[in-house]
Amino acid sequence: MRFLAAGAAAVGTAFLWRRQVEEDGPKRALKPDTALMCPLQSKQWVSADSMLLRFGLPSDEHVLGLPVPGHVMVIDDASIYRPYSPVTIDATTSGHFDLLVKHYPGGEISTQLARMRLGDLAHVRGPCGSDFTYRRGVARRMGLVAAGTGITPMWQIIQAVLNDPEDQTRISLVYASRSTDDILLRREIDAAAARHPDRFTARYVVSSAAEGETLPAGTSVGRIDAALLREHLPPPTASADERSRVLVCGPAPLLRALCGARARDGPTAPGQRRPPLGGLLRELGYPSEDVSWL
């Protein structure tokens, strides 16, 4: 019941955003009160347990209709929901959207998605957002910390910033994975960093490496700790003109370590107060108002 309530709040949050933008721009496929039926157009396994799924929209002129960052709820026949953040954004993609899905043994939704064949329909609801929505000028510098599939909403933000020629926000990404083979979207991330070396940097951390493995540039073995964050994230805000924002997305242990023991307890609707910031980010001097977890 708590999961369903959280989903309803997120849909309501994004509905407020949608009302502000629905009068302009392309056709938006998602409607808060209706499930969208999306045919599977392609499926590609990108790691041992993760797949990239492309779903069609009603026409080539339609965009999905999500804020950045945003997610959709994928629903099965038993009305079980699972949130997924697309790795495509409305600003650059129409006619389809892509989901990066990790297949968990015993996971009902991810197992059904893994079994889908081309042409099968997925039931999708949204738009869903969080209490942080990216807009140009929200910060001068952004630090993004992700683990596993927590990279997906971060990739939305990276695309939104780097594809806007008027946006001069600088982004630093710290991304943790189990191994180099599990670094999702690495090719796309590295290509973006190569195109925008003055605006975007990426640092990878893996839990382990094979004996004798040569790690790619920008990759280290270990864990996300205070020294790594201090080196690669922007410093805490020093002035209004140089505001820093830090976003964190990943499994509960990461959120607790970086943001405090109650990080998962925070409400998601705008205007509601989150639990006080704790963890490593507080130790490093970041104020609560400059940190969000997704």
Residue ranges and their predicted role:
Residues 135-141, 240-242:
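Short helix-loop-beta connector
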Residues 139, 162-171:
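Conserved S-adenosyl-L-methionine
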Residues 25-120, 177-179, 207-209:
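Ferredoxin-reductase
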Residues 126-138:
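A short, basic/flexible loop-to-alpha-helix module at the beginning of a structural domain
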